[in-house]
Amino acid sequence: MKFTVEREHLLKPLQQVSGPLGGRPTLPILGNLLLQVADGTLSLTGTDLEMEMVARVALVQPHEPGATTVPARKFFDICRGLPEGAEIAVQLEGDRMLVRSGRSRFSLSTLPAADFPNLDDWQSEVEFTLPQATMKRLIEATQFSMAHQDVRYYLNGMLFETEGEELRLSLIHISEPTR
């Protein structure tokens, strides 16, 4: 695997896919990002096993296909620390990923891409498509009553229900006796 990309084209997608990764992952591979180069595109994937985020970056310079995983935080910090407009050259050599930009050189340990959890194997029972503005409006109208740090973890989310052509978002309201 080998690719070159401009810092600005890589930084925002890196930040987005690093979002789901917690500070102390339960498995070492969950602290890594999956990098895949194929068909002129770099795909970056991060997961915490509950949520997966994928970002894609178009590669305009010559590249070689391949896949690996790298420590997310280290890779992001390296890219963020480089000057604006810097070109970042990345090359996989054995179990190390070499990152070069200008006179800077970094070597990151990798884990095999085959070990990265694949949430694509999960099959949904229901699929639906709706405009982003409609989805945003539904969430905003419901999220005010969502718990954020309740020990009853099932209250820390939103329920999406479908019935026929109807999508319903709901939250559970628990009445607790006052003393």
Language-model-derived ranges and their functions:
Residues 177-179:
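Hydrophobic heptad-repeat coiled-coil signature
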